[in-house]
Curated annotation (Swiss-Prot):
Active site, per annotation: D45 (proton acceptor)
InterPro entries named in the record: ATP-NAD_kinase_N, ATP-NAD_kinase_PpnK-typ_C, NAD/diacylglycerol_kinase_sf, NADK
Keyword annotations from UniProtKB, A to Z: ATP-binding, Cytoplasm, Kinase, NAD, NADP, Nucleotide-binding, Transferase
Residues that hold NAD(+) according to the record: D45, G46, N121, E122, R147, D149, A184, Q221
CC annotations in GO: cytoplasm
Cellular compartments annotated: Cytoplasm
Enzyme class: transferase
GO molecular function: ATP binding; metal ion binding; NAD binding; NAD+ kinase activity
Protein name per its UniProtKB record: NAD kinase
GO BP terms in the entry: NAD metabolic process; NADP biosynthetic process
Pfam short name (any one): NAD_kinase
Naturally occurring in which organism (per UniProt): Leuconostoc citreum (strain KM20)
């Protein structure tokens, strides 16, 4: 089995990576950062997002394992003190995995050119200065004209990030859906939006047509400047992200440990 290691620049992460590489090689596992079967991230959730985008073209054939170098992250199942247990799980790997939905974003330029991007967490359209004005289409029909700071579209696992801060719901990843939330929308007697998050199932599309060219499009940790973009289309991707399920933590337990203190009985 071929294993890649993707770590952040923190000194602690680099030291743990060195120890991990030595242990993997000692146990007969191959390090291959080009065409791996397993990608181990050493860092936090941001490191895992970076690894996802780095290996996005191989997403069908790889599984991720998150090793956190601080407190346990949302996507990470292992602590730096558990290297021996992790290596043991890798040596006894039988292909077990758990899969989550992804966001497919299509950027359509005025020239007609289209570019596809995949996001693990979310995408957002924001106006750095002034008000973002955009027409929102659902079911192929004009639904509303949005005015505000921006719009975010999240996957179920990404629903605990920017989406949650926007007042969106936390979706379980067994729901094959995406969620659109408003960022500081303008609602008064003249301008109205629905004012609530929208959950769209697989097979349907959210189309956003901004009325200006001065906006930013962000997906996970990447950014696109909105120049000569005619529309953006969002849907549940056909592909999924896969994690090695050696001792996979239940989704609601992840939410609990990320946001809720222990409850005294």
């Amino acid at each position: 089995m071929k294993i890649a290691i993707f770590n952040n620049d923190a000194k602690n992460s680099q030291m743990i990576t060195q120890s991990l590489v030595a242990s993997l090689e000692k146990n007969g596992l191959t390090i291959d950062n080009q065409h791996p079967d397993i990608v181990i991230t050493v860092g936090g959730d941001g490191t895992l997002l970076g690894a996802f985008q780095h290996y996005v073209d191989q997403i069908d054939t790889i599984r991720f394992v998150g090793l956190h170098t601080g407190h346990l992250g949302f996507y990470t199942d292992w602590l730096s003190t558990e290297l021996a247990n992790l290596v043991s799980s890798l040596t006894h790997d039988n292909g077990q995995r758990v899969s989550y939905p992804l966001l497919d974003m299509t950027v359509v330029h005025e020239s007609g050119e289209q570019y596809h991007f995949l996001a693990l967490n979310e995408a957002a359209i924001k106006q750095p200065v002034g008000t973002l004005v955009a027409d929102i289409y659902l079911g192929g029909q004009l639904f509303e004209r949005f005015r505000g700071d921006g719009i975010a579209v999240a996957t179920p696992t990404g629903s605990t990030a920017y989406n949650k801060a926007n007042g969106g719901a936390v979706l379980h990843p067994k729901l094959s859906a995406i969620q659109m939330s408003e960022i500081a929308s303008i609602n008064n007697r003249v301008f109205r939006t629905l004012g609530s998050p929208l959950v769209v199932p697989k097979g349907e599309e959210i189309i956003v047509k901004p009325k200006s060219n001065h906006f930013l499009v962000m997906y996970d940790q990447s950014e696109i400047k909105g120049r000569h973009i005619n529309e953006l289309r969002f849907r549940v991707a056909d592909k999924q992200v896969h994690f090695a399920a050696y001792r996979h933590v239940d989704f609601w337990q992840r939410v609990h440990r990320a946001f809720i203190n222990d409850i005294e009985s």
